[in-house]
Amino acid sequence: MKRTEEIQAESLPSSHPGNARRWAVPEAVKLYLIVSAGSVIGSVLRALASIGTLAWLGPGFPWGTLLVNVIGSFVIGFYATLTGPGGRVFAGTRQRQFVMTGICGGFTTFSMFSYETFRFVQTGSWPMAGLNVGVSITTWLVAVWLGHMVASRLNRLGGV
């Protein structure tokens, strides 16, 4: 037999606060959905950047992958520093995960970098493979450092 409270809750509209407990979404699920949404945005931006770079610079070198990974490295260095402890901008866990894990994770692509390097090796283009690895790793590290430095500078400015 149902309790009086259960019968009353069933008769309430779904938007009624009394039904909130039945429709509560666990925090972990909310975080996964937020990261997923960021990943969709990042992936679409990556596709657009790669297509645009291919049309602009041609297929001789994986410029699109290099570009998205440099931009993503800068953004994650910038955002992590700007929103980190002592940062100028407060961002909660969800916001940080949305940008850093979702958007940056969907935008950057280590797997494509690995594949493109492998293809150079497979076709005997060892100099291009070495160039790809050297230029990529160097520019990614410089970009994350620059992002960190710009955000550190902003964090020291007064105001906001």
Task: Give the location of each predicted region.
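Membrane-interface helix-loop junctions in multi-pass transporters/channels
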Residues: 1-160
